[in-house]
């Protein structure tokens, strides 16, 4: 599927399977989410541009590769997106963080915005939007729209699971934003949940219903 990268690394797929199991505990789900987010972050950042810096090792001076340009921004779609941040920030501790509050109205399935806060100079940074699920796509579409309104131009979207319906909706509005996911699942059910999915990621992460 054009514009979509499925991260099929064996460790990602193994951990995702355990997360899908209904008997996986809240603590186990949270731990696995942190682990898998680190692996996903590795993949979504694999083509970052590098420059060289003159350094001194214990043996001699040498030119060594370092990241070029402004620091990354990880933009979390609240609340479930926060579960991906911990592992990603361990991998890239210098990254800035944005928080975007949108929730899905369970009757209309539309996204309602209630919070937005992002770093300055977002137009000069690569922004990686994170949310465990790309279901209807409404929340993700709204979050990316808010980022673009603030000047963001280089955006990627990272999720654990995506539904074909959500991908179509998202790409219909934001064809310029590549999607990275661990799995494209079968479909959405009548309640807008991804099937087979893993349930509500936020509820499973925080032990709520």
From Swiss-Prot:
SUPFAM superfamilies named in the record: PRTase-like (SSF53271)
Q: Which GO terms describe its biological process?
A: UMP salvage; uracil salvage
State the Gene Ontology terms under molecular function.
GTP binding; magnesium ion binding; uracil phosphoribosyltransferase activity
Q: Where does uracil bind?
A: 194, 199-201
Query: CDD domains of this UniProt entry?
Result: PRTases_typeI
Pfam families membership: UPRTase
Q: Which cofactor does it need?
A: Mg(2+)
Cofactor binding comment, as recorded? Binds 1 Mg(2+) ion per subunit. The magnesium is bound as Mg-PRPP.
For the protein in the UniProt heading, the enzyme class is transferase
Q: Which UniProt keywords apply?
A: Allosteric enzyme, Glycosyltransferase, GTP-binding, Magnesium, Nucleotide-binding, Transferase
State whether keyword tRNA-binding applies. Answer: no
The Enzyme Commission number assigned here is 2.4.2.9
Reactions accelerated catalytically: UMP + diphosphate = 5-phospho-alpha-D-ribose 1-diphosphate + uracil
> Which pathway features in its UniProt record?
Pyrimidine metabolism; UMP biosynthesis via salvage pathway; UMP from uracil: step 1/1
Give the family, as the similarity comment puts it. Belongs to the UPRTase family.
Task of the protein:
Catalyzes the conversion of uracil and 5-phospho-alpha-D-ribose 1-diphosphate (PRPP) to UMP and diphosphate.
Protein known as: Uracil phosphoribosyltransferase
The protein's organism comes out as Sinorhizobium medicae (strain WSM419) (Ensifer medicae)
